[in-house]
Amino acid sequence: MTEQTAVAETRAEQRAGKYLTFALAGEEYGVEILKVREIIGMMDITAVPRTPEYVKGVINLRGKVIPVVDLRLKFSIEEAERTDQTCIIVVDVHGIEMGVVVDQVSEVLDIAGDAIEDSPTFGTQVDTSFILGMGKAGDKVTILLDICRVLEGDEHLVSPSGDATGDA
């Protein structure tokens, strides 16, 4: 076995596991289930001034203030009207809980390492560092996200105490 093959197998083993899948603009995405804290229905979101457009605001989840990011807007996808399927996935980003708005939660998939391919190269102008890989299940492809990288830089929306920050 070559060193390159061994590295590829180790990487495949590291990416293997359970993923919560969800729909966003008709495409299927997945996040590592260990990063998911809970799934909640849409609720009132309090807008926070002077935040990027994709930051919808904050919610009060059982007494804890959690920032909410709309993944459609984060990915430069047109905002859609909310439906009864629209929900918030609460994820752990470097020890901070954050909510992400998705169109619909699909299922939990157990994806083997050999069923995950590296993200295709789109050239130097396209950043794909937030994609763990492409999960193959049957004839469909699920884009597996590194949710920490997707939301990197957005942790500043809460302080370590979990209180909303903002310089209004």
Locate predicted features.
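An acidic, low-aromatic, low-complexity terminal/linker signal
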Residues: 1-168
